């Protein structure tokens, strides 16, 4: 659930292929000793690993090793942090409640428009994602392929309304979901990130912004 930032695999082509097949890798760095010759007993397909077609690769020589660093997905870190910081700030506008988290959200469209929302902004049963999505729809926005930034992991089940935020996000066809803090199991067991990933949504987590989310929810304790 928490994810792996870096993973070192030695002679593990099958492991690398597994991560690539699941779409779980952003960057692959491959180091090969050009002086090393494998015998027939070690030259089977399980030891071969090819970088996916279309990957942007940078090659260099380090200490006699041929190193290729290949980017499999575009680097969206700066944009993600900008929108996610805005979402965290939106969460601070929420009126604290003993029965819900204070969360902020931003819907970012490919055309550059964005829409914000925070928990209970217009209704005592609305979550932040609902508020931001409603504003986007009211403006006539097409949400398929858009990104949504939430200070906390989108809920996967809830008691106040029949549709969870995860279901709402999937129904509207969002391509990316970015958040700072996994939802604690205080009210329900949240499996939003897992459900979204299994549905093919690109999910990114930036825990370096999680402290701001904790501050917004200090009324609930740690």
PLM feature spans:
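Residues that mark the start of a beta-strand
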Residues: 4-6, 102, 147
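Zn2+-dependent cytidine deaminase-like catalytic core
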Residues: 17-22, 27-30, 34-44, 109, ...
């Amino acid at each position: 659930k928490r994810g792996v930032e870096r993973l070192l695999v030695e002679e593990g082509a099958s492991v690398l292929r597994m991560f690539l097949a699941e779409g779980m890798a952003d960057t692959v760095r491959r180091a090969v000793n050009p002086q090393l010759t494998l015998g027939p007993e070690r030259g089977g397909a399980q030891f071969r690993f090819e970088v996916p077609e279309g990957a942007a690769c940078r090659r260099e020589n380090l200490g006699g090793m041929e190193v290729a660093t290949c980017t499999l997905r575009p680097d969206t870190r700066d944009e993600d942090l900008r929108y996610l910081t805005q979402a965290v700030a939106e969460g601070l506008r929420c009126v604290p409640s003993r029965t819900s988290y204070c969360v902020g959200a931003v819907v970012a469209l490919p055309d550059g428009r964005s829409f914000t929302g925070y928990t209970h902004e217009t209704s005592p049963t609305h979550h932040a994602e609902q508020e931001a999505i409603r504003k986007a729809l009211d403006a006539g926005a097409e949400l398929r392929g858009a990104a949504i930034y939430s200070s906390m992991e989108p809920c996967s089940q809830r008691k106040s309304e029949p549709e969870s935020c995860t279901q709402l996000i999937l129904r509207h066809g969002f391509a990316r979901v970015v958040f700072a803090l996994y939802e604690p199991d205080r009210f329900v067991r949240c499996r939003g990130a897992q459900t979204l990933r299994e549905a093919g949504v690109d999910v990114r987590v930036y825990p370096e912004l999680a402290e701001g989310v904790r501050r917004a929810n200090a009324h609930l304790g740690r």
